[in-house]
């Protein structure tokens, strides 16, 4: 999904809101939806979705020149490289969090090796990558994601 979603983060929200119920959410003067507020919950911070931001674009592109497949003795080594481009068309700088995911091997004979993550935080259990970045007004940034998958020749490797 290449859409960019705005999210409002409200820390210590129960200090400001003492009654529960439905709340209407507006952003830039436009109605974006409803949410239920339930005081006494276990979370002290609440996240509210503000919808899609058309002023921020993101594109993930496979770099074919840096993708390859090599045969090594009894294994095949697949290399994948992607470029993630983020563009801020707003008049102000933005804080952005980008998520992607590396494949997770279901078989012990398959090895996924992280090569280039452009500083992403990686979760070993889920394979989720997270980048946090500031992009100045009317500017763009690029991230590189490169990984290798080594698998036995007899095995067909598929990604979901």
Q: Across the structure, where does each feature detected by a protein language model lie?
A:
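Intrinsically disordered, low-complexity Ser/Thr/Pro/Gly-rich interaction regions
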Residues: 1-83, 90-111, 116-119, 137-147, ...
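Beta-strand-connecting loop/turn residues
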Residues: 44, 125-129
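A surface-exposed beta-strand-loop module
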Residues: 128-140
